[in-house]
Amino acid sequence: MVGEFEIKDEDLAGRIGIIETKSGKLETPVFFPVINPFKSEISIKDIENLGFKNLITNAYLIKKITNTKIQDIHSFLQFNGVIMTDSGAYQILQYGNIEVTNREIVEYERDINTDIAVYLDLPTGDTNSRDEAINSVKITLERAKEIEDIVKNDSERIWVHPIQGGRFLDLVEYSAIEADKNEAFKMLALGSPTVVMEKYDYSLLIDMVFIAKSNVSRGKPFHLFGGGLPHIMPLVIALGVDSFDSASYILYARDNRYITRSRVYRLEELEYFPCSCPICLKYTPKELLELPKEERTKLLALHNLYVIKEELNAIKQAIREGRLFEYIQEKAYSHPAVYSAFKKILKYKDYLEKYDPRVKGNIRGIFLFDLKSLNRPEIVRHYNFLDRINKNNDKAIIICEKRENILKKVKNNENVDIYLFNPFYGLIPINLIEVYPYFQTEYPEEIDEDVLRYIESKIVEFVRSKGYTKIDFIGCEKYLSHINSIGAFFS
């Protein structure tokens, strides 16, 4: 059925899913290249040949420029894949107004037989005026009600309800809650992030996505308008974004900007291409610069699309393997703005833990590196577990030696609770040492001091809260610098 969304795999709050449309199934996370059919630097066939089975175009511009009745958008674009149409809201953001009503453009999108359609919302944009933001939320919600009769009677399309509010997070929350209530709309989308992303204000973007996602149903696919840079994609996918659209690939190409999975370069800055796509294998940066403008733009645009597709595939693989946290941790060091976004995500670790699957089909080892790793769901879950357990005895032994030596140490110890020390999990009850994820965890040989200090504090907090009267430590001098004082406190 059109609009059905089946989740196939999950990691953190991100997921791989299948959206059912009348023109076929879409696997998410998915990127919709923005297409302007009236500019020919790169053809739809070129994009299709890269493996893209979907695109987005502007219904308002097509209506305005053609000035004729189009029977079918697929025939007009000569594209049989999934077509999403925007309504002209971006033009409102740019120019302040457009010459079409909400109902007119919605009827037009229906009549040209698009697959996924957006009604004419009013973008909040990057305004600092709360009154303007309130007005954009109010009008966006009103316009959804205005065309609800069309949407409810249209079973062939997925209709998208935008969420507005901009930098005013309480308005984003209200807009998200109200949008989610409207069951006629099978897809939700966060509007107005384009300017935020252009300014590299990724920390605010993370807040906006989190607030929106945490207040809507997990059963509806969630779209991010304007999300076209690979280095931010995995972070918002980790929060639950399922699809993106952007013209960045062509806009950047026109400006000689070269997208990589970690950052954006100006073509003039490069001596070597850090990529092995067909374009980068054939040309050097110098050779590409010497080509005519139109040809260079096309080739750069194709490269940029290759990179976006490659990034999405890497993210999906990370989700499959349960390594999305490790992946975004690695991505964080690509740019200071991305690092700020990663730090902001860590503040939402309880949200990530809530939706992260406890165990996946193929159990894989997890990698822990530094203090940031303590925010991944497995660690959060472990400390929540420690909070819930009760002591069985008044005395406890904490063993810091290698696993293979543990059984010898505890053989004759009865009437005592025994824990294995781990520099990231803190304390692991002895009967769980071979349970996932403890036995499947890898970490550096040398542990950062800030990690050890944090773990020491967690151990003190744990033994105090459980009411142990005596604690013995075995082989812990290497890890716990204040071990003597800790032991004395509980002896």
From Swiss-Prot:
Pathway: tRNA modification; archaeosine-tRNA biosynthesis. Binds 1 zinc ion per subunit. Keywords: Glycosyltransferase, Metal-binding, Transferase, tRNA processing, Zinc. Its EC number is 2.4.2.48. GO terms for biological process: tRNA wobble guanine modification. The active site is at D86. GO terms for molecular function: pentosyltransferase activity; zinc ion binding. Zn(2+) binds at C275, C277, C280. Substrate binds at D121. Its cofactor is Zn(2+). It catalyses: guanosine(15) in tRNA + 7-cyano-7-deazaguanine = 7-cyano-7-carbaguanosine(15) in tRNA + guanine. GO terms for cellular component: cytoplasm. PANTHER family: QUEUINE TRNA-RIBOSYLTRANSFERASE. Exchanges the guanine residue with 7-cyano-7-deazaguanine (preQ0) at position 15 in the dihydrouridine loop (D-loop) of archaeal tRNAs. Belongs to the archaeosine tRNA-ribosyltransferase family. This is tRNA-guanine(15) transglycosylase. It comes from Sulfurisphaera tokodaii (strain DSM 16993 / JCM 10545 / NBRC 100140 / 7).
